[in-house]
Amino acid sequence: MSRSVWKGPFVDSYVLKKAEKSKESGRNEVIKIWSRRSTILPQFVGLTFGVYNGRKHIPVNVTEDMIGQKFGEYSPTRTYYGHAADKKAKRK
């Protein structure tokens, strides 16, 4: 079920404040955020966010294609190492 249109996109207030400060300063620093649930807005295009995945901050460069999606979609929380090899088959 998608979010109601009249509510608008959800963005944590501190993410908006950090993005505004970064744009005003003009420096292209990584903005560390913990809000994976926040929606990517058009004013974030061109900025780099460090999205926390539970262990470290993953740098995410925001492009126009990402608008309307969540930050958490670009910071995977699980690492897949593949299935373990069968030791019996290896021995032969």
UniProtKB/Swiss-Prot annotation:
NCBIfam families: rpsS_bact. This is Small ribosomal subunit protein uS19. Keywords: Ribonucleoprotein, Ribosomal protein, RNA-binding, rRNA-binding. Belongs to the universal ribosomal protein uS19 family. GO terms for cellular component: cytoplasm; small ribosomal subunit. It comes from Jannaschia sp. (strain CCS1). One of its GO terms (biological process) is translation. The gene is rpsS. GO terms for molecular function: rRNA binding; structural constituent of ribosome. PROSITE patterns: RIBOSOMAL_S19. Protein S19 forms a complex with S13 that binds strongly to the 16S ribosomal RNA. It holds the Pfam family Ribosomal_S19.
